[in-house]
Design a protein with these regions (language model features):
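Long amphipathic alpha-helical segments
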Residues: 2-3, 8-104
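Short, glycine-rich nucleotide/cofactor-binding loops
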Residues: 14, 26-29, 134-140, 212-217
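Glycine/charged-rich beta-loop-alpha catalytic/anionic-binding loops adjacent to active sites
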Residues: 17-26, 64, 103-108, 156-160, ...
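Gly/Ser/Thr-rich loops at beta-strand to alpha-helix junctions
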Residues: 32-33, 134-144, 167-168
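Ligand-binding beta-strand-loop-alpha-helix segment within the catalytic cores
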Residues: 87-131, 144, 149, 159-203
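Histidine-anchored nucleotide/phosphate-binding helix
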Residues: 141-153, 226
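Conserved phosphate- and dinucleotide-binding cores of soluble alpha/beta proteins
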Residues: 157, 163-302
Length: 302
């Protein structure tokens, strides 16, 4: 497993690891699930080429690097949860090469939690789909994609309508991914959201961060979509692994919320042609939450 320092493949050097995490920190299109899985994959590759001499600094670099990624992408609650898990499992290790194996086990376990969680979420979502359902979504959530694929596989899904999701236009990407998997999908302009809701049996959006009181931070456009669904009495579900849930409520005081949102926007991820890519959803606008534990009216902590 280990190599001499002179024999490291280029993709496992400290500079390459830092470069890969920097690229993830600047990624403005991928969802938190994709970012988290890619970060853990890079960490695993980096740690798998350790020596007795460098295992400790490498483990420290992984902990610090993923913490920094979570800070720079601080709209992503899942990355906060993953960073906390990495620090909890790896901090203090690295005194012997045996810690390389333990660190790898911890990283792989976190990856498995993410992958198995999405699989469990997809299976538990099936009762929410009426027969031959028309589903409505927006942006490009890997969780929503997995749920839709499973619903299609189990013959619960007829087709999907995806809002374009400007300013980033991630909805177009999701349509391509759905069609690649054989799912009938149509991209509609955001301005036609009302018409889209009129055709839908249910709506699904992926959360970026969920607070324990049920407040959600998600892509801009979700709030008017939720209002339209409420008006048309179309169920509106928010998907989010329990690792996305922050263990405290978000203040309802307007200035405190503005400050919280400004903290997200300050990293650059929240800026687009309209100056904002994220917005809050209040709990009373949602039919409920979908996690690896199934459907619930309130979010559950990991």
């Amino acid at each position: 497993m280990s190599k001499s320092s002179a024999g490291f493949p280029p993709q496992t050097t400290p500079s390459h690891f830092e470069k890969r995490l920097r690229a993830l920190s600047k990624d403005r299109r991928s969802g938190s699930g994709t970012l988290a899985r890619n970060a853990l994959r890079e960490a695993e590759r980096f740690l798998a080429n350790s020596t007795e001499e460098n295992i400790r600094p490498r483990i420290e670099q992984v902990v610090e690097g993923i913490e920094r990624l979570a800070h720079e992408q601080r709209a992503m609650g899942l990355l906060q949860g993953v960073a906390e898990g990495v620090k909890r499992e790896l901090a203090g290790r690295g005194r012997t090469l045996a810690d390389e194996g333990r660190a790898l086990v911890a990283i792989r376990s976190l990856r498995a939690v993410l992958e198995q969680g999405v699989g469990s979420m997809s299976a538990r979502a099936l009762p929410l789909f009426p027969a031959k359902a028309v589903a409505l979504t927006m942006s490009d959530s890997s969780e929503v994609l997995a749920v839709l694929r499973e619903a299609r596989r189990r013959r619960r899904l007829a087709r999907v309508i995806v809002l374009e999701s400007l300013p980033g236009g991630e909805g177009r990407t999701l349509v391509r991914r759905l069609r690649t998997g054989g799912i009938s999908a149509t991209c509609m302009p955001d301005a036609l959201a009302s018409a889209a809701v009129g055709q839908a049996d249910l709506a699904l959006v992926g959360a970026d961060t969920i607070w324990s009181d049920g407040t959600v931070l998600t892509k801009v456009g979700a709030h008017p979509l939720a209002l339209l669904c409420a008006y048309r009495k179309v169920p509106f579900y928010v998907t989010g692994l329990s690792l996305k849930v922050r263990p405290h409520p978000l203040s309802r005081e307007p200035r405190a919320r503005r400050k919280a949102l400004d903290g997200v926007l300050a990293d650059g991820r929240g800026t687009g042609s309209d100056g904002k890519l994220f917005e809050f959803l209040e709990p009373d606008l949602m039919t409920g939450f979908l996690s690896e534990r199934g459907f619930s009216k309130k979010p559950s902590l990991a």
